[in-house]
Structure formats: structure tokens, C-alpha cells
Amino acid sequence: MDILKYAKERHIRVIPEIDIPGHSRAAIKAMNARYQKYIDTDQSKAEEYLLTDFADTSQYLSAQNFTDNVINVAMPSTYHFLEKVIDEIVQMYQDAGVELTAFHVGGDEVPEGIWEGSSICRTFMQENELTNIRDLKDYFLEQILEMLDKRTYRQSDGRTLL
């Protein structure tokens, strides 16, 4: 919050970024640890923000040489997690007295092979009449942009920055 206030005093606009669905290894690892913490006592709480399908057999290598840094966009818990993060960022801007005018969601560097081995993704694609992985990614980004629109500010999807 101090950074936001400091920037505002100097007429600098800070644009938050959640680079998704790729570049998400830290979030995935953190939510996997949360899952392990709660799975024996509260399955619902364990799965609340889960970002990965443990049965996914997809094989890929990201530009950063990771094989586990892309969130599963077919899981309701992924959207729940992103709503939580976005709402926390919105609240931080409000608390700092800074207008949130843009939001960057990334969308780049999603490696070939992602989601192909996820039965959750296959089922989701069938239910939503998506024909390929590109359609799934586009569907996800549209959902995120709608999520941001509901919070009344502009967004950027990694192809253009407002």
C-alpha cells in the first residue's frame, strides 16, 4: 500500500498484473501446500483455492523450463482463487485512496501440451463446446476479463497495455 501512496504523490500510475494462466508456479505451489495442510481435516477448505489437477498427465516445458507453472483453467477453484486475489488488490487500492484504472492479466507464454492430459479440461471443453486448447485458453481469458469488468475498471490481456 505504501508503494501505491508513494506513486500517487508523484503522479505515477501503478498497474497491477496477475500473469495467468502461465507464470503461476508460486501460486500453484502455495495452494498445493494449503491443500496438504487441510486435506486430512477439511476437504472443502483444502480444495477451495486449488489450482492444479493432480491427475493431469499433460507434458509441457515452459519458457522458464518449468513443467508445473500453468494453472488449470477448468477448475471452479481456480476462478475462486482469482476472485479472491483480484478482490484483495481492489481493496488495497481503495484503502490507499488510489483509483484502479487498469489491470494486466498476462495470458502469454502458455506452453504447447498444456491441459491435454487433464480429464477435467476435456470434460469442461465438452460441456462448453470448446474444440481445442486455444479455445479453452480464450474462454478462460474472457471469463477473467468479465470478472474484471464487474469490478468497473479497464484491463489488459498481455497483447496490448492500456
Where are the predicted features?
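Surface-exposed extracellular loop regions of Gram-negative outer-membrane beta-barrel proteins
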Residues: R154-L162
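Substrate-binding cleft of carbohydrate-active enzyme catalytic domains
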Residues: M1-R151
